[in-house]
UniProtKB/Swiss-Prot annotation:
Cellular component per GO, a single term: membrane
Cellular compartment(s): Membrane
Topology in membrane: Multi-pass membrane protein
TM regions (residue ranges): 367-387, 405-425
Protein name per Swiss-Prot or TrEMBL: Putative magnesium transporter MRS2-D
Keywords, in A-Z order: Ion transport, Magnesium, Membrane, Transmembrane, Transmembrane helix, Transport
SS bond list: none
Basic and acidic residues bias spans: 279-291
Cross-referenced Gene3D superfamilies: 2.40.128.330, Magnesium transport protein CorA, transmembrane region
Signal sequence bounds: none
Amino acid sequence: MAARRRHVAAGAGAPAPAAGEWAAVTAGGGAAWALSPVEEVGTKQELMRRTGLPPRDLRALDPALSSAASASSCRPSAITGRDRAVVVNLDRARAVITASEVLVPSPRDPAVAPLVRELRARLALAASPTPAPSPSPPQHGMAVGMDGSISPSQASRGGEEAAGNGKDGEALGGGDKALPFEFRALEVCLEFACKSLEHETCTLEKEAYPALDELTSKVSTLNLERVRQIKSRLVAISGKVQKVRDELEHLLDDDMDMAALHLTEKLAYQSSRFDIDKEASELEDHSSRDEEGVEGGGGGDGDDETIAGGGSFSPNTDELEILLESYFVQIDGTLNSLSTLREYVEDTEDYINMMLDEKQNQLLQMGILLSTGTLVSSCAIAVTGVFGINVHISLYDSPASSAAFPCAAAGIVAGSLALYLAALLCYKRAGILQ
């Protein structure tokens, strides 16, 4: 009771979304809110029974841990197939997909709410228009042990329900084979993740190209700071897009991982295996009671073992492969756009560096000119100082002494200019000055 009061008080005082809320979107498009705080062991165990997921998968979808990982730019992207569920963790698209429903954490988060609305709209559109009872959650249709395994009897009922949903989908499509529920939900998650990353990329491009062009025309502290922020965002978005692309590429390269995503066929396969094993057991009991001959009983058992043990779960992954390839092409195009923008940023940086080098060369040339002028002026001052010594010479007594001063001054100035021009000529011949 105390834990419940604390939770209600915290939820009533802050409008922010609670970290333990989950939205359950069923095959008919309906959504139900389910409070599942991580700190309450009972509710967490209920989620584990409902989805058959280990605790580490639920922790990976924890919004608090995801926010911390996103802030440190190390948030993983993964599509993992488990026994009864598919864990989707692609940037903002985080969900647990079962054969009959989709569980989305933190549905009131403004970044996640569009995903919930899209799931409700798309799944409701794909559902049968005839009124039918919504499929029961996995915890009511299947019994889960401590290790997450499914009991054969409940797996049989789950497989029949999943097969029924598949038939309804085929009837909707007018004879065309419809995608299973988990593929439709996965498609919505992939589309949401790709569109959100594409939207971020387009927004960044609209801000980046004008800022880079302005920087090339005018290098200032404000423009440099804008470009620095744009480059930081570019690195962050490129990392997220690259992780999603790598995950899709990994799935396309691994048929076993793609086979693990076929939840509906997996349930139907488990149901058929259970029926075969049950028939084999009944036939064995009947043979042992009615026939006492070893040869007849052994032959019958061998045939049953061949039926029961032959083959393994290997679904046709063509539909899933086509689905993943379409979004792989889309996310690869987004990555190419980011690569083009990165090249444009690098070209702009090279251009700015060339401009700065040119300015630096001009400053160095100006320093050489000033240093040479200072040297020539020092020489002229030294000559003037020599003539300024108070020593009596015959020039003072000469009648032309009145004209000697301007001639000496003009000679010093002319000599200084000639020496300066000679130094400049030597610099140009040596290639120091342009």
